[in-house]
Amino acid sequence: MSKGKINVSVENIFPLIKKFLYSDHEIFLRELVSNATDATLKLKHLSSIGELKGNIGDPKIEIKVDKSKKTLSVIDQGIGMTQDEVKKYINEVAFSGAEEFLEKYKDKDNQSNIIGHFGLGFYSSFMVAKKVEIITKSYKKDPAAKWICDGSPEYSLTKFDKKDRGTEIILHIDKDSTEFLEDSRIKTLLEKYNKFMPIPIKFGM
């Protein structure tokens, strides 16, 4: 198991995300589904050029809500990540230059465009979640990994027993955001933001 800080210079990122990034917290779902779609399209590309052996099946994205546990999960069957890739993409790349950028743009009206510039889409999860887990297994032979962060700059990263390729992001929904545990709310958001996605999305029965 490894523990660490995401980046010493970005300890103010989380409050900035909550306060400034989006006045509309609902956009987190669009960002997570977009990331899941990218991971799945990359898998299909690797398969098409022969870098991935075997049948990848018909990968889909699944959204699950567990009201008793107060969690919302976004699950894909895409390329997944190794532990090293989680460290690189979640803990380092996503924060590259973000603090300075957010400070510059936090008073502007075009806040909805900020996230894509720095790969911060994943971190919009913390607008509605008090804790976020990533469980992921790469298409490579590396063991699966589990990353946990409670909205502070500190995280834990461990090996995990996951057999199937892909990534599951589990949001432990904050008490102020329980609307995102309602099926009707999620259906509305998927209709609004993710209606014409190239990968099928499953939610509900």
Language model segments and positions:
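GHKL (Bergerat-fold) ATPase N-terminal catalytic module, capturing the glycine-rich phosphate-binding loop
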Residues: 1-175, 179-180, 188
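TRNA-binding/sensing appendages of the translation machinery
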Residues: 194
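A short amphipathic beta-strand at an alpha->beta junction
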Residues: 198-205
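Charged, low-complexity intrinsically disordered tails
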Residues: 182-183, 187, 197
